[in-house]
UniProtKB/Swiss-Prot annotation:
Top-level taxon: Bacteria
Name this protein carries in UniProt: Thymidylate synthase
Quaternary structure annotation from Swiss-Prot or TrEMBL: Homodimer.
Known catalytic reactions: dUMP + (6R)-5,10-methylene-5,6,7,8-tetrahydrofolate = 7,8-dihydrofolate + dTMP
Gene that this polypeptide is encoded by: thyA
Keyword presence, Metal-binding: no
Known role: Catalyzes the reductive methylation of 2'-deoxyuridine-5'-monophosphate (dUMP) to 2'-deoxythymidine-5'-monophosphate (dTMP) while utilizing 5,10-methylenetetrahydrofolate (mTHF) as the methyl donor and reductant in the reaction, yielding dihydrofolate (DHF) as a by-product. This enzymatic reaction provides an intracellular de novo source of dTMP, an essential precursor for DNA biosynthesis.
């Protein structure tokens, strides 16, 4: 994950000191791109240990179309607790928009299913996109989507995906985002009998929170290790039938975790 270390170094070197919604303050740059060849390994950060269970369960939660943290909490995942209301709901965020996008006419659109149909019937389509940024629902969301739009591309029977992320917490959030979408590419490739290609990541406001800067400086002193491999142990009948036990990470030997405070 040399790309990630390079990004941190750039933010520290040329970032702009900005105020932010949480009051913490950030060191920020605008516009950044990274590319990960999934054939060369699973891009799970090695310069600090990542909690892979949180990454997988969150992705499965999104794919269920769920917006209540009960499923996450049942599986001992607490990453969304700070944004849930008393009933455990976080509003119409990722899962709702991916699986049940509401139209002005009162219809619901399953964007993920539509992409799967296109990948199988018309893989050269330029319309294989999923958006989480439903303007009419933003005010109902406890936390508006940070990773807002992703698009699929097929060539030579190989599946690639590009993500646009409007706001990126580089120290805490970005390692999760990279791993999560890489897993999703593996899952969809398996379902559509495709090979995995590239994951391309584009960030808008890409930042280190001020209380993470010293932690990030510690992290960039660590030399990235060999990437692990992701194996999916079985092929369910549909994309929506995977469970946590279907995924195996092989050869993950990270440095110890570096804990940072979440800005809410």
């Amino acid at each position: 994950m040399k790309q990630y270390i390079k990004l941190i170094k750039k933010i520290i070197r040329v970032g702009n000191q900005k105020k932010d919604r949480t009051g913490t303050g950030t060191l920020s740059i605008f516009g950044y791109n990274m590319k990960f060849d999934l054939k060369k390994g699973f891009p799970l950060l090695t310069t600090k240990k990542c909690h892979i269970a949180s990454i997988i369960y969150e992705l499965l939660w999104f794919l269920k179309g769920d917006t209540n943290i009960a499923y996450l909490n049942e599986n001992k995942i607490s990453i969304w607790n700070n944004w849930a209301n008393e009933s455990g709901d976080v509003g119409p965020i990722y899962g709702k928009q991916w699986r049940n996008w509401s139209t002005p006419e009162g219809h619901e659109i399953d964007q993920i299913k539509n992409v799967l149909i296109q990948l199988k019937k018309n893989p050269d389509s330029r319309r294989m996109l999923v958006s989480s940024w439903n303007v009419g629902d933003i005010d109902k969301m406890r936390l508006p989507p940070c990773h807002v739009l992703f698009q699929f591309y097929v060539f030579n029977n190989t599946l690639s995906c590009q993500l646009y992320q409007r706001s990126c917490d580089v120290f805490l959030g970005l390692p999760f985002n990279i791993a999560s979408y890489s897993i999703l590419i593996h899952m969809i490739a398996q379902q559509c009998d495709l090979k995995v290609g590239d994951f391309l990541w584009t960030g808008g406001d890409v930042h280190l929170y001020n209380n993470h800067i010293e932690l990030a400086k510690k992290q960039i002193l660590r030399i990235p290790r060999t990437l692990p491999k992701l194996t999916i142990l079985k092929k369910p009948q549909s994309l929506f039938q995977y469970c946590f036990e279907d995924f195996k990470i092989i050869g993950y030997h990270p440095y110890p975790a570096i804990k940072g405070e979440i800005s809410i």
